[in-house]
């Protein structure tokens, strides 16, 4: 009898849960519906290593190169690289290939943990760009081209810039404007597009960084599209990047035992984009349009919308829910949805973020709508905003260094406040 991790996973799948968290495929139904069930049936037999004919991730000549060229054509870039260490590995390699050891890097203050790890590995000096704040929710908004221009003028030694867009909440910076600014200073722009691999294919969402002049773009294909968790793609989009230097860094960062299951899922995702992309993305957008229209009718429910932003644009495949008017924090709302077997991605203060993906069905959105309506009806109608705990009241009189001062304290992915009692 399996225990631990396996037992948990089997128990969870037995709930027939609705997934509004990564990965984007949302389970096996998408693969089976599109005719890829045979791969799932033989998945254990496909777990191999670099046998003859299987190519080599770090010296591609055959089937892996073909898949990389598939992505190169799909995204319209100069070169694409498969990643089996996620976008994290791609960001680290891209930064180390763009900044000399001991050099300086301009980075948005809300960058992913991987960027800070790259600073350590490359002995790189950070120059922080501060995003605008979305004051209502206390979350990071856009990083502006003016902020990047100011920093590049003040720090001419910093020749590379990295920032996330979309960020975790779906807020997108003006990548075209930032790229123009960075290139006017003869710099390199690296975009962490972990949350935006779908933007290239959805005309009603913000423009993809691949179409906005970024030099390196890293896409977490698994987050919103159809590949397996931990699979991603790095795109090189200009002549400013030395491919041999980048490839050398990728070899240093990535595992020497790359998973053929992850790479195969990237291959299948590429096929899905080419053969079924138009219909899938059209249905995805239609489902979102219906959801937002119907959700606006639910009393006490707010959603972060493009009109709410201080600047930039909004990737509305991230549904940011707020029921604080009914006395529910994001964490409380999450627990109410879990009771109904609906699992979401992220809570921050009053926000509960539902990450939609290419595998979500119309029924998923209908179940979420029904659950939100039910929750709204069971809660009081009073305007009881959830307040943050005053920081001064919670601050200890005496502070001390961590018991392990060498360990970074960087939040990423699941950022959860204290649970409500």
Where do the model's predicted regions map?
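N-terminal glycine-rich, Lys/His-bearing helix-loop that initiates the first secondary-structure elements
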Residues: 1-43
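Conserved PLP-enzyme active-site core in the AAT-like
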Residues: 6-10, 74-77, 87-305, 323
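Structured loops at beta-to-helix junctions and adjacent beta-edge loops in soluble globular domains
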Residues: 23-25, 164-166, 322-324, 357
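Conserved N-terminal alpha-helix of the aminotransferase class I/II PLP-enzyme fold
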Residues: 43-86
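Short glycine-rich or small-residue beta-strand-to-loop segments that form or flank ligand, phosphate
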Residues: 54, 81-83, 161-164, 352-355
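Conserved C-terminal alpha-helix-loop-beta "cap" of PLP-dependent enzymes
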Residues: 290-421
